[in-house]
């Protein structure tokens, strides 16, 4: 089963009440949704919530890096999760938020066919 299509969607979720840290107030969760579709139309979903002050990633950086990762993963075996990780790690250091969204989506595909 090969990866046929990958889509990324920015999703901003307003919080009912902003939370405040020493770094300032946060009024919304700025997430990225990843949808991976295999060549048999099995779909896996993943999501990440990057937070600049914790991991150095933002919704915008995740979208940019995610597009590069998506291009590289097209045609890859959707069930070879370790191989997908190795490919992403060879492409770019760190960026674990967006990589985790891809990981979750690949695991979701595996769960869908189990």
Residue ranges and their predicted role:
Residues 1-55:
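Structured beta-strand/loop patches that form or line metal/cofactor-binding pockets in enzymes
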Residues 37-114:
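Metal- or metallocofactor-binding catalytic centers and their adjacent structured scaffolds
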